[in-house]
Swiss-Prot record:
Cellular component GO terms held in the UniProt record: cytosolic small ribosomal subunit
Biased amino acid composition, Basic residues: 111-130
HAMAP family the record matches: Ribosomal_uS9_B
Pfam family, one: Ribosomal_S9
UniProt name for this protein: Small ribosomal subunit protein uS9
Domain of life, per lineage: Bacteria
Length: 130
């Protein structure tokens, strides 16, 4: 018999996370590595676990994640978004808790592009009066 699994896709900045929730003990595996090994910062590990805390499902599901693109923060945000979406498939009643915590909203903030004639997106070259 096929094992029950719930799938969610999360995005943040340039990162995309494909998340699989399987009933289990609460183990989180990201790109075939344990969460402690893959995410070096405790604060980002907490960000990833926010949807589980909001729905009080910590320890109920094993989470397998494939994530690519971006850096630590973008990937953590993408995984969080993916877990929240997968939890919606588990139980649609979670929507209220997840939405009030702001976990279902795709964070649309992106890096602003560099403009010609400037050193960065907004940083201008040094101005000399004389």
């Amino acid at each position: 018999m096929a094992q029950v699994q719930y799938i969610g896709t999360g995005r943040r900045k340039s990162s995309v996370a494909r998340v699989r929730l399987v009933p289990g003990t609460g183990k989180i595996v990201i790109n075939k590595r344990e969460i402690e090994e893959y995410v070096p910062f405790a604060a980002l590990r907490e960000v990833i676990k926010q949807p589980l805390v909001a729905t009080e499902t910590t320890g109920s599901y094993d989470i397998h994640v494939n994530v690519n693109g971006g850096g630590y923060t973008g990937q953590a945000g993408a995984v969080r978004h993916g877990i929240a979406r997968a939890l919606l498939q588990v139980d649609p009643d979670f929507r209220a808790a997840l939405k009030s915590a702001g976990l279902l909203t795709r964070d649309s903030r992106m890096k602003e592009r560099k403009k010609p004639g400037l050193r960065g997106a907004r940083r201008a070259p040094q101005f000399s009066k004389r």
